[in-house]
From Swiss-Prot:
Annotated Pfam families: DUF188
Sequence segments annotated as region (Disordered): 110-144
Domain of life: Bacteria
Protein name, as recorded: UPF0178 protein Exig_1155
Organism: Exiguobacterium sibiricum (strain DSM 17290 / CCUG 55495 / CIP 109462 / JCM 13490 / 255-15)
HAMAP family: UPF0178 (MF_00489)
Ranges of biased composition (kind: Basic residues): 113-124
Family per record: Belongs to the UPF0178 family.
Length: 144
């Protein structure tokens, strides 16, 4: 099992690496975001719409875990029989991904029509704790 991090804008890169001891961890980013972290291999992809997402999906295997806040990438990871988790500890499942994709679509339609939608709130320690708990549970389930 490998851990794939959609590293562009991911606030839990260091936390994920720390929790993933004993597993291969890959940070995938585009040329506008450079990462070099001990305990992880960095894969840099050329810039392009969804280039990082497709790079992860094309490299991952069934059973791998993807850390992403991108619902589209999460859906692709699930389709490849992987698991996906966001930076706040929400585990994406076949049961919740359709609703999340629909919510994203509605937000895009509102913005295209000139409307505004809420942006993300400031990150809290509780979100880090939630991520740590959920991610640790995923790792434990994989080793049982």
């Amino acid at each position: 099992m490998k851990i794939w991090i959609d590293a562009d804008g991911c606030p839990v890169v260091d936390l994920t690496i720390r929790l993933s001891r004993g597993y291969e961890v890959f940070l995938v980013c585009d040329t506008a975001h450079q990462f070099n972290r001990a305990g992880a291999t960095t894969i840099t992809i050329g810039q392009g719409h969804d280039a990082v997402d497709f790079a992860i999906v094309n490299r991952m295997a069934p059973g791998d875990i993807v850390v992403t806040q991108d619902y589209g990438l999460a859906a692709l990871a699930l389709a490849r029989k992987g698991q996906a988790i966001d930076q706040n500890g929400r585990v994406f499942t076949n049961e919740n991904i359709d609703f999340l994709l629909h919510t994203r679509h509605v937000g895009q339609e509102i913005r295209r029509a000139g409307g505004r939608t809420k942006g993300p709130k400031k990150r809290t320690r509780q979100e880090d704790a939630s991520f740590e708990q959920s991610f640790s549970r995923l790792l434990t389930e994989k080793t049982d």
